[in-house]
Regions:
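Acidic, low-complexity intrinsically disordered tails
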Residues: 1-19
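Long, charged low-complexity intrinsically disordered regions
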Residues: 18-197
Length: 197
């Protein structure tokens, strides 16, 4: 179970005062939990993606050096300026960016969880977005999405419970693309579904 071990090594247990109780897994994609007389159905990919995204955006992700740096040739002064504006933020999320000379840049390290290509990064950097912050957010979202546990991947009980606990600590219960991490059914809604009073 090395993928789960590697992917979830940094998941920390939430203090026991948490009222969340992990119930089980469903359809290889969902985690079931109970809290405050409500049933929560969590999307394991969306929850893990959000946790990774927040870590990346808070500069907690590890970086790894590239044996062969990404080489980026800017095609205009505006692209060069764009990269200059993004340089500090890129470094904060794990992309070590060095300007070799006007029009020539190198990325010498990437976030540990980055699975994109040089082309992916270049496309994200030079996409026609006004705010540099949105570009950084897009890069972090792509990194988190590709690194998050996939649908159909079986998580053991301990890992599932940790993921559920941490999902309930998130300030924003949505993946970086806006999908909700969970759906909630109250006790009353469940009773109504089975025609019980």
């Amino acid at each position: 179970n090395s993928y789960a071990d590697e992917t979830f090594t940094n998941l920390e247990s939430v203090p026991k005062k948490s009222e969340v109780r992990f119930i089980g897994r469903c359809l290889g994609t969902f985690l079931l939990a109970e809290k405050d007389n409500n049933l929560f159905i969590l999307d394991q990919h969306a929850a893990h993606e959000r946790l990774l995204f927040d870590k990346i955006m808070n500069s907690q992700g590890a970086s790894q050096p590239l044996l062969i740096p990404y080489k980026i040739h800017t095609e205009s002064k505006s692209q060069d300026n764009q990269l200059e504006k993004l340089k500090t933020k890129l470094t904060q999320i794990g992309f070590e960016t060095i300007k070799k000379e006007d029009g020539y840049w190198e990325i010498t390290s990437i976030p540990e969880r980055w699975t994109g290509t040089e082309y992916d990064l270049r496309t994200l950097i030079f996409v026609k977005q006004v705010e540099p912050e949105q570009i950084i957010r897009s890069i972090a979202a792509m990194t988190a999405c590709k690194a998050a546990v996939k649908d159909g991947y079986y998580l053991d009980d301990e890992t599932s419970a940790k993921l559920v606990e941490q999902a309930f600590t998130l300030e924003d219960p949505h993946c970086p693309h806006g999908r909700p991490i969970y759906t909630v059914f109250s006790r009353e809604q469940l009773f109504e579904l089975v025609k019980r009073t």
